[in-house]
């Protein structure tokens, strides 16, 4: 038997095998809340035999979303839907994981099938982007973000802590930070 199909333990978390489903954005949330799409999608992946299923990039704040369709854990109301996903993944035999992050200068973008470019701040669905420096991501995402202040940095740091706590409350056993 190859190592791929053997259990793997990291600290107090044991995976049934070494197959992990990485976080892949679904862009199907509403205002940061998971929808009817999410639970069957992730539970189905767990039923497929993976040892670890990591839920998509989940924003720590509304302005930290990549698109308006991204999931979030910036408020307590978002825990319930995420808990149903974590519980379903665990019931299917996999370890529930989640990736939390802040999109920075790549935020406020359209979903890939809607153009994958920035949504301007004043347009419907768009918001102000912030980043450590006022430098655009590149030609595909040319919007120049507002340079973060020290207060912004402290707030985003606190947002990561709060989202991690909510992820734990929702039942996730594996946390991945995207920065």
PLM region spans:
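Non-globular sequence segments
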Residues: 87, 95, 101-168
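Short, acidic/polar
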Residues: 33-45, 155-165
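Conserved, mostly hydrophobic/aromatic
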Residues: 21, 45, 49, 89, ...
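N-terminal binding-site loop/beta-alpha segment at the start of enzyme catalytic domains
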Residues: 10-11, 17-36
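Short beta-strand segments
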Residues: 22, 99-101, 176-178
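Catalytic domains of carbohydrate-active enzymes, especially glycoside hydrolases
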Residues: 39-61, 170-174
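N-terminal amphipathic alpha-helix/helix-capping segment at the start of soluble metabolic enzymes
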Residues: 1-20, 89
């Amino acid at each position: 038997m190859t190592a791929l199909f053997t259990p793997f333990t990291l600290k107090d978390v044991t995976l049934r095998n070494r197959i992990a489903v990485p976080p892949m954005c679904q862009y199907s949330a509403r205002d940061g809340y998971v929808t009817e799409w999410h639970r069957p999608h992730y539970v189905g992946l767990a039923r497929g035999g993976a040892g670890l299923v990591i839920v998509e990039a989940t924003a720590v704040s509304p302005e930290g979303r990549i698109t308006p369709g991204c999931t979030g854990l910036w408020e307590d109301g978002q825990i319930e839907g995420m808990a149903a996903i974590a519980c379903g993944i665990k019931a299917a035999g996999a370890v529930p994981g989640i990736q939390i992050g802040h999109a920075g200068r790549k935020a406020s973008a359209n979903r890939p099938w809607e153009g994958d470019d920035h949504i301007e701040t004043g347009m419907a669905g768009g918001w102000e982007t912030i980043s450590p420096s006022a430098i655009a991501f590149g030609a595909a995402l040319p919007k120049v973000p507002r340079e973060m202040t020290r207060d912004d940095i402290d707030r985003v740091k606190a947002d990561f802590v709060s989202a991690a706590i909510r992820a734990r409350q929702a039942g996730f056993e594996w946390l991945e930070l995207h920065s």
